[in-house]
């Protein structure tokens, strides 16, 4: 009997428990809220908001405000100084370093011991449980898994608090038994210089029997490409003949899918999306034929959703399919009614399944067009399909007024395979955006409000060079896809040596 068959039996009880997500979503979420309130009622935050008097969701909403990072920052800073019982019981030792706010370069998201085990690691375990349920012939544990971690090794900060990328924190605290089926070595995984780490990982992993890989698609592709160059091979299965699954998250997979399918031609290869962030682990793609993800309802996360078209937050049982919501979470790491910054759309409410539609700050609405990241991904996928092009990285922002008084969207795109006709690619992208976004279509009518979009071709490695200059190469760092501001795109254009306008 294979090792996977033996280990797989451990996941059977959880596979059965996940069936509760089909029709007990509200009950699961109410139980999570009750646990969070009871656990934190004697903390400073719990006393200040009278947690002991909260009897249900309505009381919770009436007594606890919706918070941004800035509003919790003072408490988090005190926790980092070593104070206890502030937002969550006891002392919180670990803090996940995340991209910053308007006022700060970085955010420091508390990661409690309970949150580490019952949110972050629970998500990893459930990803495997669901994969094994869907693929009973899997042999993933008969080999090793390549886990691509973040670019900041955990380091001692204030009062012995520890700070690092979430992925680095997970590697630091992982069960030692997992190291028996994982590559690379911990020292390599936690290297801060991504360019050095990429080569070390390739060297350590190329002669191993790797069956599964986990990480951010863009950075994993860089590692795999490096390994192909070292080995002189064309396809990944020539190096790892038993590779079978890629657990990916952090950025949308659509722009990278074609490149992975060219790199890995094995018919046994599977791709499974997860939604994990510094703040928690929220969703898993439970059906390989459906790009939407199952919302994980029985971790230490209570969800609320703010309609992007206006209105008060609603609990899970108040959401509607097809609407765009900003996600709000309360967690066993001490985040209370915290705006995470992501937007989602539900595709089903039985079970609760969703897609990530974008970021609350990553959109273009300069002229009332309300373009979101999901629109952009669909538009690019269509243009690539029609032209045979492949997009590696991109960003877009508005041009508010040029010398001819014309407003438009400006796209900066790095292609791994350039379209033969860039004008046609731009036309197809513009056409598809109008088909899927009625607001964009209305603003494009007769070019009155919004002119035809402009595409500028980025030179090779432009986006990586930009991230490197900002000290954000590798790990969970990502390129902002859409922005109402020109701050990012202007910085990128100044670095760009190729001006291939449409």
Give residue ranges: language-model regions.
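Ser/Thr-glycine-rich phosphate-binding loops at phosphate-binding pockets of nucleotides
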Residues: 95-104, 277-279, 346
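Short, charged helix-to-loop "capping" segments that act as catalytic/coupling loops
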Residues: 105, 115-119, 263-270
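Extended alpha-helical, oligomerization-prone segments that build pores/tubes and scaffolds
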Residues: 121-124, 129-145, 180-184, 200
């Amino acid at each position: 009997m294979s090792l996977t068959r033996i280990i797989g039996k451990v996941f059977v009880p959880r596979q059965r428990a996940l069936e509760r997500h089909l029709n007990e979503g509200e009950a699961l979420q109410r139980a999570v809220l009750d646990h969070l309130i009871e656990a934190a009622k004697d903390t400073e935050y719990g006393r200040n908001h009278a947690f002991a008097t909260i009897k249900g969701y309505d009381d919770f909403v009436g007594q606890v405000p919706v918070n941004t990072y800035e509003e919790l920052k003072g408490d988090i800073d005190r926790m980092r100084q070593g104070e206890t019982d502030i937002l969550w019981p006891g002392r919180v030792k670990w803090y996940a370093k995340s991209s910053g706010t308007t006022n700060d370069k970085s955010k420091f998201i508390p990661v409690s011991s309970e949150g580490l085990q019952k949110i972050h690691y629970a998500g990893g375990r459930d990803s495997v449980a669901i994969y094994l349920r869907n693929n009973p012939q899997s042999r993933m544990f008969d080999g090793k898994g390549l886990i691509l971690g973040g670019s900041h090794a955990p380091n001692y900060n204030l009062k012995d608090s520890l700070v690092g990328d979430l992925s680095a924190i997970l590697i630091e605290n992982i069960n030692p038994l997992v190291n028996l089926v994982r590559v690379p070595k911990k020292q390599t995984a936690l290297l801060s210089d991504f360019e050095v780490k990429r080569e070390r990982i390739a060297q350590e992993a190329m002669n191993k029997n790797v069956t599964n890989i986990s990480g951010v698609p863009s950075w994993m592709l860089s590692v795999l490409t490096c390994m192909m160059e070292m080995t002189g091979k064309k396809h990944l299965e020539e190096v790892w003949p038993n590779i079978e699954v890629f657990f990916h998250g952090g950025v949308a997979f659509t722009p990278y899918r074609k490149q992975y399918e060219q790199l890995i031609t094995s018919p046994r290869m599977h791709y499974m999306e997860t939604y994990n962030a510094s703040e928690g682990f929220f969703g898993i793609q439970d059906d390989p034929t459906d790009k939407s993800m199952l919302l994980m309802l029985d971790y230490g996360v209570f969800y609320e959703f703010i309609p992007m078209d206006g209105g008060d937050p609603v609990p899970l049982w108040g959401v509607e399919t097809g609407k765009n919501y900003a996600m709000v979470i309360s967690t066993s790491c001490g985040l209370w009614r915290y705006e995470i910054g992501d937007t989602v759309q539900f595709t089903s409410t039985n079970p609760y399944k969703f897609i990530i539609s974008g970021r609350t700050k990553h959109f273009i609405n300069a002229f009332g067009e309300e373009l979101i990241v999901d629109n952009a991904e669909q538009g690019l996928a269509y243009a690539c399909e029609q032209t045979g092009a492949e997009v590696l990285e991109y960003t877009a922002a508005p041009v508010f007024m040029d010398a001819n008084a014309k407003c438009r969207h400006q796209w900066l795109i790095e292609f791994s395979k350039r379209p033969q006709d860039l004008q046609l690619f731009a036309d197809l992208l513009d056409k598809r955006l109008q088909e899927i976004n009625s607001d964009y279509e209305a603003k494009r009518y007769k070019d009155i409000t919004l002119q035809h979009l402009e595409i500028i071709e980025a030179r090779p490695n432009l986006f990586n060079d930009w991230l490197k200059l900002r000290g954000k190469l590798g790990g969970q760092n990502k390129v902002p896809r859409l922005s109402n501001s020109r701050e990012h795109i202007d910085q990128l254009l100044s670095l760009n040596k190729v001006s291939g306008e449409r």
